[in-house]
């Protein structure tokens, strides 16, 4: 019985440590015009994911779990249309500003 109590305490301790630590790398998976995540084949840092992340308004991204992950990508910029609307400086699309 004592082993079960000790095991339970260890499980609770480790779960609390994980929740206290929080997210080390806040970010998100960006989505394209169809709502799908961008697929990538070269895991880790690569030019394709950096380019995708720049389209979404952040400067750094990499391939994680075969999808592009953009660090510090906010929820409002996850979809490509919202990212363009929030970061585009094209005066033809927005003649009076945003």
From Swiss-Prot:
Pfam annotation, one family: Toxin_3
Asparagine amide sites (modified residues): 96
Gene name linked to the record: LVP1a
LCN-type CS-alpha/beta domain sequence ranges: 26-89
Gene3D superfamilies: Knottin, scorpion toxin-like
Function per UniProt: The heterodimer non-edited LVP1 induces lipolysis in rat adipocytes. Induction of lipolysis by LVP1 appears to be mediated through the beta-2 adrenergic receptor pathway (ADRB2). The edited BmKBTx, similar to beta-toxins, may modulate voltage-gated sodium channels (Nav) and may block voltage-gated potassium channels (Kv). Seems to be a rare component in the venom.
Alphabetized UniProt keyword annotations: Amidation, Disulfide bond, G-protein coupled receptor impairing toxin, Ion channel impairing toxin, Neurotoxin, Potassium channel impairing toxin, Secreted, Signal, Toxin, Voltage-gated potassium channel impairing toxin, Voltage-gated sodium channel impairing toxin
Subcellular location: Secreted
Domain notes: Has the structural arrangement of an alpha-helix connected to antiparallel beta-sheets by disulfide bonds (CS-alpha/beta).
Similarity-based family: Belongs to the long (3 C-C) scorpion toxin superfamily.
Feature type site, description Important for inhibiting sodium channels, in non-edited version: 43, 46, 62, 64
GO molecular function, one term: sodium channel inhibitor activity
Oligomeric form and interacting partners: Monomer (edited version) and heterodimer (non-edited version) of this alpha chain and a beta chain (AC Q95P90).
Descriptive protein name: Lipolysis-activating peptide 1-alpha chain
Annotated signal peptide: 1-22
Tissue expression notes: Expressed by the venom gland.
Site residues (Important for blocking potassium channels, in non-edited version), renumbered to this chain: 48, 51
GO cellular component, one term: extracellular region
Disulfide bonds: 40-63, 49-68, 53-70
Organism ancestry: Eukaryota, Metazoa, Ecdysozoa, Arthropoda, Chelicerata
């Amino acid at each position: 019985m004592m082993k079960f109590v000790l095991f339970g305490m260890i499980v609770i301790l480790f779960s609390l440590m994980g929740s206290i630590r929080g997210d080390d790398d806040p970010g998100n998976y960006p989505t394209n015009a169809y709502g799908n995540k961008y697929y990538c084949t070269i895991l880790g840092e690569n030019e394709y994911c950096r380019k995708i992340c720049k389209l979404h308004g952040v400067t750094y991204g990499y391939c994680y779990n075969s999808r592009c992950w953009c660090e510090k990508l906010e929820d409002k910029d996850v979809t490509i249309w919202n990212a363009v609307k929030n970061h585009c400086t094209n005066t033809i699309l927005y003649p009076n500003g945003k």
